[in-house]
Amino acid sequence: MNIKTRFAPSPTGYLHIGNIRTALYAWLFARKQGGKFVLRIEDTNTVHLDNDEVIKNIISIMKWLRLDWDEGPYFQTKRLNRYNSIIYDMLQNNIAYRCFCSEERLSLLRLNQMKSGEKPKYDGRCRTICMFKNNAMLNTNRIIDSDKGSYVVRFCNPDVGKVSFYDQVRGMITFDNCELDDIIIQRSNGVPTYNFCVVVDDMDMNITHVVRGEEHINNTPRQINILKALRAEIPQYIHVPMILDQNRKKLSKRHGKSGIMQYRNDGFLPEAILNCLVRLGWSYGNQEIFSMDQMKKYFDFSEIHKSASVFDINKLMWFNHYYINHLPVNHIIKYLSEYIQIQNISDIDSVKLIDLVNLFSKRSHTLKEMIFNYRYLCKDFNIFEKKIAKKYLIPTMINPLKFFRKKLNNISNWTIKTVQTTIKETVHELNMNMNMVGMALRVALIGSDKSPSMSIVVYIIGKCQVLDRIDRAIDYINSLSHD
């Protein structure tokens, strides 16, 4: 069998956690089996909308995550002639029919069925009375019941027997055909529906394995019946469990913190996102960290869990911190450079990114946090916090601060190593309590008593700023002495 999977998002919203996990599972299976992966944009539901931005976002995110595709992207709106041609053939062969029932009649039908405890579904009225008229309309190319106005096209679903399929996550699933109604395959505006287009696409593109969310389970028997009516091969189905937020509610595309673009903008790495998502519903022993090669090697549908998974942002932060500190430094520099460009960050152009990575990776969970930590040290300030200044910027610290200034001013080659050595030698020469003098220097430089090591602070701020800030702290202490 030539394995072929697909990822078929609808451009009704930006890609979210659930979308990408589905894409990842389908991609991993295709790559593991040496098969092909197809990207398809299911845009018939948005045919009258301007969704270019969303489509660009889908393609951009897929490329950023390096989930490459072998075919596509295909667009359903460019295949309308194909769908309509098949619908025409189905009408001619009496496996579909025109339905002229008004919305008022259908609403009343649903209401009466619900009142009597029945499952709401179409009663097949036009199936029995319109079959002859459907053929007549095809032959004469005119609408016979012009007084009835617009119509939809429905599929003649079998009304007896069962439809069964083996789901590779849940096992055998069976539906009674009598429980399924004649679904609409073409709307009154002439646009084919999702349930029909997806069938034709999977058939034409020779999709062998359909990987999608469990919310599509009820669509599967309807789609299988259409495939059978078209005498097409039935693909294998894999319905993955839903993803919940930490309140155990469904994480949907409308959830503020589910969009992949948002995570990219927040400074998360592709490796961290994919590693986190592959573990949402799949496991391989107790292993947590997986490279892409390991994912392809170990991934199997049989290990996907049936129960819903909970997405934990703290877990994603943990993965991101791991990859920031374990990927090659040049990889992180590349990501950081791209992030700075995308976010239009202009205030760190002069900073050596390798220094930024080496100095802040241990205490940063995201690229955004890494830049924030840098900015926190470099930001200028005019006012010292009184409580902290009162404790550390005291008259006895004036001479130690002046001595530090002199030593730091003498550094000709400003590197992290020369700064570290100078600070160490200065503390030794002062023969003072490092906690006290170190805190005074820290408050002088960043206005706070919390920061990374002093050598990092001094190096990142830069020589000129360090000297200016020490002078300002000394002036501040002197001003208090004169009050």
UniProtKB/Swiss-Prot annotation:
Function, as annotated: Catalyzes the attachment of glutamate to tRNA(Glu) in a two-step reaction: glutamate is first activated by ATP to form Glu-AMP and then transferred to the acceptor end of tRNA(Glu).
Assigned EC number: 6.1.1.17
PANTHER family according to UniProt: GLUTAMATE--TRNA LIGASE, GLUTAMATE--TRNA LIGASE, MITOCHONDRIAL-RELATED
Phylogenetic lineage: Bacteria, Pseudomonadati, Pseudomonadota, Gammaproteobacteria, Enterobacterales
Catalytic activity: tRNA(Glu) + L-glutamate + ATP = L-glutamyl-tRNA(Glu) + AMP + diphosphate
List of residues binding ATP: 253
Subunit composition and interactions: Monomer.
Biological processes annotated in GO: glutamyl-tRNA aminoacylation
CC terms in the record's Gene Ontology section: cytosol
InterPro entries recorded: aa-tRNA-synth_I_cd-bd, aa-tRNA-synth_I_codon-bd_sub2, aa-tRNA-synth_I_CS, aa_tRNA-synth_I_cd-bd_sf, Glu-tRNA-ligase_bac/mito, Glu/Gln-tRNA-synth, Glu/Gln-tRNA-synth_Ib_cat-dom, GluQ/Sye
Species whose genome carries this gene: Blochmanniella floridana
Predominant location: cytoplasm
Subcellular location per the Swiss-Prot or TrEMBL entry: Cytoplasm
Keywords from the UniProt entry: Aminoacyl-tRNA synthetase, ATP-binding, Cytoplasm, Ligase, Nucleotide-binding, Protein biosynthesis
One Pfam family named in its UniProt record: Anticodon_2
UniProt-recorded Gene Ontology molecular function terms: ATP binding; glutamate-tRNA ligase activity; tRNA binding; zinc ion binding
Protein name: Glutamate--tRNA ligase
Similarity annotation: Belongs to the class-I aminoacyl-tRNA synthetase family. Glutamate--tRNA ligase type 1 subfamily.
Motif 'HIGH' region, residue numbers: 9-19
Motif range ('KMSKS' region): 250-254
